[in-house]
């Protein structure tokens, strides 16, 4: 008997590996399954590189299964070597706790917690913190062979350059997590990124050895790779965070709206809850009228709404449309700063007033001759208003909040002029 959820995951390309394909299908067909996915609090916010495993877990919730969302307050004190070429810097306990609180809030955007079968947040510090060193070595270490651990890719790739005993034992801690959740909540499936395969199978093996549990499974999702081979989730400005204070909803929206034609359908399948028919219709539009960018708009709107809400999405669209149209007058100072964060920032002495001198001093035009031509030809805009008078003098009215002026040269070249 096929399972609708698994068929949907396969269609979306979300299944990379399964420890027991028929076993997972059987339990999903016969019962409401409790399953989990975890993240270590390495920062006080998740970024979009963390999203896919948790969105996949949410798909299980949409089909009636119960997610456990694990925040690694314990394992975060240690550091996962998976996918890392060098040792992590240990965080203080206070920093880890701050990070846990930040991520907890974000999980409430991704999962439903307040229903009868809602998700549950758990922190592995609650049980790992209770295990003494002697208990760890006797109760758990005795069941884990060194040769078995050395066979893990996450360990092997680090042996050449060195790995501390601290990180070497990480996989045992995550294995303990799976066992604890299995015995406490009857959790039978762990979901994770493809780099978590070794940690997931360690948990299944530890449960089998310690108390004969054979009904435990793992499912991993693929690494998100862009068509150009570049790392997903990074911009020139760094990571794209879920925290609006780190990455504004406008910047978040812009990240998704700028998805290439080659990636957009894959990302619609990965990151949205749109049905197959809706995505296929967007794919048809992409093939027949790519200039409309309907697929990109659907992606940006759905993901931004899911993470930041409708109001933030509306603001992001409004700012985007105003900037595209050059309608700067309709935006507040904070929205302008947000929208022009990545344009060249230039400084101007407050004494300089004449428009020609202004655009030469700031480097917007290369010479006074070029500056005069730019002004005369209508290529210069002050705060969105074309200025064609070479004798124009900037006044306090041209300073937004007495702090900056937006100058545009040509159709799209913007500069934020800050006053010394």
From Swiss-Prot:
Residues 353-420 form the S4 RNA-binding domain. ATP binds at residue 234. PROSITE patterns: AA_TRNA_LIGASE_I, S4. GO terms for biological process: tyrosyl-tRNA aminoacylation. One of its GO terms (molecular function) is ATP binding. A motif ('HIGH' region) lies at residues 41-50. L-tyrosine binds at residues 36, 170, 174. Pfam families: SYY_C-terminal, tRNA-synt_1b. GO terms for cellular component: cytosol. Its EC number is 6.1.1.1. Keywords: Aminoacyl-tRNA synthetase, ATP-binding, Cytoplasm, Ligase, Nucleotide-binding, Protein biosynthesis, RNA-binding. A motif ('KMSKS' region) lies at residues 231-235. The keyword Aminoacyl-tRNA synthetase applies. The keyword Ribonucleoprotein does not apply. It is found in: Cytoplasm. It catalyses: tRNA(Tyr) + L-tyrosine + ATP = L-tyrosyl-tRNA(Tyr) + AMP + diphosphate + H(+). InterPro entries: aa-tRNA-synth_I_CS, aa-tRNA-synth_Ic, Rossmann-like_a/b/a_fold, S4_RNA-bd, S4_RNA-bd_sf, SYY-like_C, Tyr-tRNA-ligase, Tyr-tRNA-ligase_bac-type. Its main location: cytoplasm. Catalyzes the attachment of tyrosine to tRNA(Tyr) in a two-step reaction: tyrosine is first activated by ATP to form Tyr-AMP and then transferred to the acceptor end of tRNA(Tyr). Belongs to the class-I aminoacyl-tRNA synthetase family. TyrS type 1 subfamily. Homodimer. This is Tyrosine--tRNA ligase. It comes from Staphylococcus saprophyticus subsp. saprophyticus (strain ATCC 15305 / DSM 20229 / NCIMB 8711 / NCTC 7292 / S-41). The lineage of its organism: Bacteria, Bacillati, Bacillota, Bacilli, Bacillales.
